Amino acid sequence: MRRRARAVAVLVTAFVLAAFAPALDTGGDAGLSVRAGAQAAAPRSATLVIEARGSTYVPATVTVGGGGTLTVVNLDTYDHTVTSTAVDERGEPLFDVRVAAGTTATVTGVEALANGRYDYHCRFHPFMRGVLVVEDSTGEVGADPVAFEQPLVVPRVVRGADVRLVMRQAKVRMLPRGPRTTMWTYGGSYPGPTIVGRAGRESRVTFVHRLPRKAGALTTHLHGDHHAASEDGQPTTHLIRRGRSRTYRYPLTYGGDPEPASFFFYHDHRMDRTARNNWRGLQGMFIVEDAASRRLRLPKGRRDLPLMISERSFTRRNQLTDPFAQGPTMQGHHGTMAFTGPGSPPDDHTVGSHVVVNGRYAPFHRVSATRYRLRLLNAAPFSAYNLSLSDGRPFVQIGTGNGLLRTPVVRTQLNLGPAQRADVIVDFSGESGQDVVLQSVPDADERGTGSRAAPVMQFRVGAPARDRSRLPARLPSPDLVTAPAEVSKTWTFDIGGDERHGTFWAINGKPFDPGRSDHRTRLGSVERWRLRNTSDMTHYVHIHAQQWRTVSRNGTRPPPWERGLEDTWRLDPGEYVDVAARFADHTGPFMIHCHMLDHEDHGMMARFDVVR
């Protein structure tokens, strides 16, 4: 990822030394740093530096005097932001500036801040964090605590063998005040209805395309499910044209047996437009129930909550911003594509200012002081959420998105990247009359891109209630395939191209070409694959259509929460994960790709074929 030319950094370093000489000290091996200064009074203005190969702000704590300005110098080859963690009454950061690689910028809004300490971070690399101290200020702008003003909406549930959803534009309540937000929806809501299917019984879902003309042709992928290639939401074929419909057939079986109880989600998967179409609202949840899970005395009914966590940014009129309007320019065509201009790899990050749950910003939900089942889904286009509860109580994880674990795992934090899911039990007993906040906190492991810090939603705990649920010591987990000793295929995730001709996200050195098969495997065979990240950024790798076992992570046994079935894995820089599956039932082309959706759209996808 650091293959970009270093000339920009060298030139900007020279510029900084000339233009910011009073504020910078270049002595020693520590790189550029802000001079402490001999004055007792706080400086009126200050400079913040992001160094080449930047992973920190220098200095980590910077002080600005009343009415002063904060200048940011980015010597790195990545774009970065300086974004306030605290927000105003609309949920917007108190300050937020993007600083392109090899440039400088002034952080607007600092001069109006009241005295105090303000945490900030990089939206694109959340492990980068710092503190701004404002002194001697006459400003009155300060942080507003998140109010949790609107109730959580649980999407309506649709059951039955035949489901019909109209993809149409609709106005959706996302923010607590002001106009509703216009979105592209499945069935008029965001998220779309939660589809519930019975394992072993075919579910037929018809999608009718009535979205505006600019939506173009669409395709729907049932993420995590096992089905035929024609039903997989192919990125360039089997498309749904405007005014037309298509029925997808999901048998909900694997190898002739019913699929295990699962928590999938459905979303648009159109080539080059996946990030845009998901951002506009084409997402929904899908639950598979089986006989074994129904016999368990897990929380059910109103105490079984599917929660889709994502993020969006809004205009002053509560409409979605369009982060794709000024996107990069594609050079060439699929198979040889590269991208130039702003937002080209590795600076392609669709990050929202507001975290939303089931489509609403900062919702609250009233619960009794009993056990609840939370089905947690990260449907964000880029960000990871490291989830915890504000009072320190644990999650008891009973499953992944693809089935139950063999034994429950007690966790105080759940790090979910894009497309990852966790099935957990939370016991709210002992908290009557209290509020418990589900929050995302910085990840202590800073090897990768990191997780954003933000309140997610609030649980308002009421009185105790009768609770018949139980937490089994052992769960009916699906059988795992026996993994071969040898690796059949290695998939390497990195960046390709150069600054002059354009860059692209690559798998095994190549951008995606829908007409090229990068691996062929026999129907009925069992293969062990290695997923390897040689870039400087975390990726979340998703493999379509099979039931995958995590064999090892960096050569060692995976952690307990990765010992069930999976379809999406976190890969930090330098990591590798071995996975294995039996290629059952269906032949044809399937996809492997990064589920950071801009990465997928900008080349980090490959095709493999199952053949007879």
Please give the residue ranges for each predicted region:
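Secretory targeting and sorting signals
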Residues: 2-25
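Short, hydrophobic/aromatic beta-strand segments
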Residues: 80-84, 176, 214-222, 280, ...
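Non-cytosolic beta-sheet module surface loops
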Residues: 73-76, 124, 197, 207-211, ...
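Extracellular/periplasmic metallocenter environments
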Residues: 31-37, 41-44, 48-52, 99-142, ...
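N-terminal, post-signal-peptide metal-ligating segments of extracellular/periplasmic oxidoreductases
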Residues: 34-76, 134-239, 245-247, 335-374, ...
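Active/binding-pocket-proximal capping segment
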Residues: 391-403, 534-564, 597-600, 609-612
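Histidine- and aromatic-rich segments of cupredoxin/plastocyanin-like copper-binding domains
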Residues: 227-243, 249, 325, 329-479, ...
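Extended terminal and domain-junction accessory segments
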Residues: 135-168, 276-321, 400, 404-538, ...
